[in-house]
Amino acid sequence: MFARILGLDVGTKTVGVSVSDLLGMTAQPVETIKIDSEAGELGFERLGVLIKEYKPEKVVLGLPKHMNGDEGIRAEASRDYGTKLANEFGLEVAYQDERLTTAQAEKVLIDGGVRRKERKKSIDKLAAVLILQNYLDAHALKL
């Protein structure tokens, strides 16, 4: 069965969104959604539109871990977001270690000559691409 997977990089102010191809081989950037986690605005209205558009079978959330592998407050917040997302949309939610993905995304943008102002707009969705691509690579179908 061919189906897409959404990848999310969830922060306190934005959610970077990526999507896989139907074969589950590559991740592409979609957009960055502004949120306000402290006010309870989680971006679910916009995510609902994207879920209807892409019809994913699953959503992969980045799981922020400490360098020693321990989970802290941000990982707990990510898991809480995932639980709310699963309850809201009835989709399976998986988690992918996101250590260093934002740093990798920033390096890619800097190496590509992207100006600081533009990097700020793109970094979260590129981090979402890296999170999803890492997940796809780790769960690749053995053909």
UniProtKB/Swiss-Prot annotation:
Belongs to the YqgF nuclease family. GO terms for biological process: rRNA 5'-end processing. InterPro entries: RNaseH-like_sf, YqgF, YqgF/RNaseH-like_dom, YqgF/RNaseH-like_dom_sf. It comes from the Bacteria. HAMAP family: Nuclease_YqgF. Its main location: cytoplasm. Its EC number is 3.1.-.-. GO terms for cellular component: cytosol. It is found in: Cytoplasm. This is Putative pre-16S rRNA nuclease. The gene is ybeB.
